[in-house]
Amino acid sequence: MNRTVFCTFLQREAEGLDFQLYPGELGKRIFNEISKEAWRQWMSKQTMLINEKKLSTMNPEDRKLLEQEMTKFLFEGHDIQIDGYTPPEK
């Protein structure tokens, strides 16, 4: 049976993550408050950030930046802004 959560990002009930994907207290919060759909959206944004800003997940400063951006995106409603990126037209 799938686990459902009230997703803070989507502001509705949605399928929850299968397990805690991120360590610590923030990871617990993500597991309890973020849906699979919202997590997929974050992963897409994170990939863009890593590629466009040439970040390394091995660099502690880059990991800190990614964590800050993740928190702003998932819990504070801030979209990721990447200089020079224009989203495709629908």
UniProtKB/Swiss-Prot annotation:
Entries under InterPro entries matching the protein: Fe_traffick_prot_YggX, Fe_traffick_prot_YggX_sf
Record protein name field: Probable Fe(2+)-trafficking protein
Recorded family membership: Belongs to the Fe(2+)-trafficking protein family.
Organism for this UniProt entry: Photorhabdus laumondii subsp. laumondii (strain DSM 15139 / CIP 105565 / TT01) (Photorhabdus luminescens subsp. laumondii)
UniProt subunit comment: Monomer.
SUPFAM superfamilies: YggX-like
GO biological process: cellular response to oxidative stress
Source organism superkingdom: Bacteria
Disulfides per UniProt: none
